[in-house]
Design a protein with these regions (language model features):
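Charged phosphate-binding loop/patch that engages nucleotide di/tri-phosphates or the phosphate backbone
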Residues: 2, 130-152
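Conserved alpha-helical elements of sugar-nucleotide-dependent glycosyltransferases
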Residues: 18-26, 84-88
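Conserved catalytic cores of phosphodiester-cleaving nucleases, focusing on short active-site segments
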Residues: 30, 58-75
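A structural signal for short, well-ordered beta-strand segments and their strand-loop junctions
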Residues: 37, 68-70, 100-103
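Nucleic-acid nuclease catalytic cores
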Residues: 90-119
Length: 152
């Protein structure tokens, strides 16, 4: 790996590692969890053809507390959540177990966890800006200052 910041590396390079540090941090800090969603399915070159609610299946199911958990990582730049992922998360949150977003900051070496509905309030009340990925997909750019970090 070069000294280039992670977010500036090519997608193919980031794909090899994305989520690993954040998911390890989640597993170390939580109990009663089981892997639920996809973790870079090998050999599935057309994964992006699947419906969003399948592609964006939450990473974990947890029994105590009872919830679905989507884990994401961030560094110095804002957290970027694709609009299509937000739509899928809304579908998952409609099930009987609430959906939480669990965010690991490699910069802070700390985590934030927020219910999906609270995340939507953060986005709406703070007029979170939209951005565009190179391939044209829109995302919400959420400042780390808006997230409820552990111990704050």
């Amino acid at each position: 790996m070069t000294n280039q910041p992670f977010h500036q590396a090519s997608y193919n390079h980031r794909f090899q590692f994305m989520g690993d540090e954040a998911e390890t941090a989640f597993e170390e800090r939580n109990t009663q969890w089981a892997r639920f969603g996809f973790n870079r399915p090998e050999g599935m070159t057309k994964f992006h053809y699947l419906p969003h609610v399948i592609r964006y299946t939450p990473d974990y199911v947890q029994a105590d507390p009872t919830r679905l958990v989507e884990v994401m990582g961030m560094g110095k730049t804002p957290l970027k959540i694709k609009m299509e992922k937000i739509a899928a998360m809304q579908w998952w949150d409609g099930l009987e177990a609430p959906l939480y977003l669990w965010v690991w900051s490699s910069t802070r070496q700390n985590f934030a966890q927020v219910k999906f509905r609270e995340l939507m309030n953060i986005i709406n009340k703070n007029d979170v800006p939209l951005g565009n990925f190179a391939e044209g997909k829109k995302y919400f750019s959420i400042s780390s200052k808006l997230l409820p970090w552990d111990g704050d």
